[in-house]
Amino acid sequence: MAAVKKHLRFALVAAITIALLVAGSVADESSEDIDNIVIKTPLDIPRCDSPLCSLFRIGLCGDKCFCVPLPIVGICVPSV
């Protein structure tokens, strides 16, 4: 049970890190257009159909999310 919690905690940290990296790369590309800043709230971010996914079963996350592979399972991350 402790190993599962450890992997889920790692998955959450990985998802947050990836989301921040994606947001940072998007911000770097559009730094010239300061008038077009859009701040997304949790209500604007799409919900995934499932929190966990597998690369062997495509489509578990839904249309607006993608699967981030981890050592055992993957996690669904919203496409922002």
UniProtKB/Swiss-Prot annotation:
Keywords in alphabetical order: Disulfide bond, Ion channel impairing toxin, Knottin, Neurotoxin, Plant defense, Secreted, Signal, Toxin, Voltage-gated sodium channel impairing toxin
Keyword Disulfide bond set for record: yes
Maturation-removed propeptide residues: 28-44
Gene Ontology biological process terms from the UniProt entry: defense response
Tissues in which the UniProt entry reports expression: Expressed in trichomes, that are stiff epidermal hairs located on the surface of petioles and leaves. Not expressed in other aerial parts.
Entry similarity comment: Belongs to the gympietide family.
Name of this protein: Moroidotoxin A
Species for this entry: Dendrocnide moroides (Gympie stinging tree)
